[in-house]
């Protein structure tokens, strides 16, 4: 009986040399307003070349350089091989090869959509079959689309090369042995300092006694859960919280607050602390602060970080503060800048960099516990394995604190500052949370922008807009300036960044003098940026004007809010 196979199957086609960009990678697709779900993988700013170097093990600089431009990509690559595997192996998905454009970053470049079946079978996309636009600058992103509202999938993407190019043979990394002695030794290296343990031990004892305890996390995209899949279950904050519950909890007495916002530094973190950490009414007993890879964007180079730490330390319920230093794929973080704050206040500190970086460069059979490929989701964010390592590093600190004798409550108020934390009483001002000491004239900023950065807070299974109570000016609302008169010795202006061409610049004036121009296009994606309009002034009424820049008067501009000095209670 025939099984329906071909009578004369073709000989196999010889595979071209290839570069794996993504191998056995787990992604999470999020619900879109128009329906379905998507998972984008961003490849601009050298990230495509970095994938080829880190995962594909390409060392040829000429090949890596070709991957940085649209012209070079088409010269090097013959075809793109893609596979997607989901629990439901019969559904359809779409893969989008999205080139970024010169005239309009997101819209004027080539977009090639290919249908896939989610059974893990590879589909090869020849570049010769693509109708290329002339405006392409670089490979911007790979996007995976699904019909459902949420999906977790495992993907592979490789580049098959044109004749004349070669690439190293791809050898998959071994999985991490989380139960090995080598793993435990690696985690122990994350321990920087126990610091004064009295506040952390107080929270531990409360949890053991069945009293309510809240463990809170504030930081950037890593704290938000970027790279973990599914993020709300496997991000480091949730896993570390679970570890704390397992060690010390009694039933459901330990509570969780997560306030990570991608692409933001402690400059915004100190402003949103009351809303995002205290806003639900819980006063945290433990706060983990994670800005070690975000604070390059802090224009004060440490003032805002120390401000946030002091704001937490001096809270009336005296919470423990733990400083967590995460790391980028290039081994970089700001530990040397920020750890002196931990030393000055004798705080518990944990360094993921100290744990993992040295062993990255050991051979697989000579001490390496986890490779960069398995630790990093992209050049900025850890995978679920990486998030677990971060959580286990915090858990190691919890265990050390539990085992140590209790210290004496320190006199934090007697300590000198490391930087200049003048913003300790900073608060958020927006359309909703006003301030009696402020007089606002909206001018042409009469609309509310709803196209915002969305994040998953706490244990929410939905995304919340960041700073939704804003002021937006459009071409139709005119170009009258936004004016705020406020009694405060400093003022920070929070504005929206966007990669969309309809957003333009705005000029900021303080007491009639020009101070800065805010350019939403500088970063190239939708998120929030805080900038100091003025500081160190007399605590009297100052006038701040925000005017559309004359070059972009026909464009939109969004003011998300302000950070001002709240009168002390």
Task: Go through the PLM ranges and name each one.
Residues 1-218, 223-230, 249-252, 388, ...:
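N-terminal secretory targeting modules
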Residues 187-193, 331-433:
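Catalytic His-Asp segment of secreted/periplasmic serine-dependent ester chemistry enzymes
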Residues 195-204, 237-241, 266-280, 302-311, ...:
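Alpha-helical scaffolding within the catalytic cores
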Residues 214-218, 223, 255-260, 285-291, ...:
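Structural recognition of the beta-strand scaffold that forms the well-ordered cores
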Residues 216-217, 228, 266-302:
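Oxyanion-hole/transition-state-stabilizing segment in secreted/luminal serine hydrolases
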Residues 221-224, 261-266, 292-298, 319, ...:
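Solvent-exposed loop/turn segments at secondary-structure junctions
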Residues 238-255:
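Signal peptide-proximal N-terminal region
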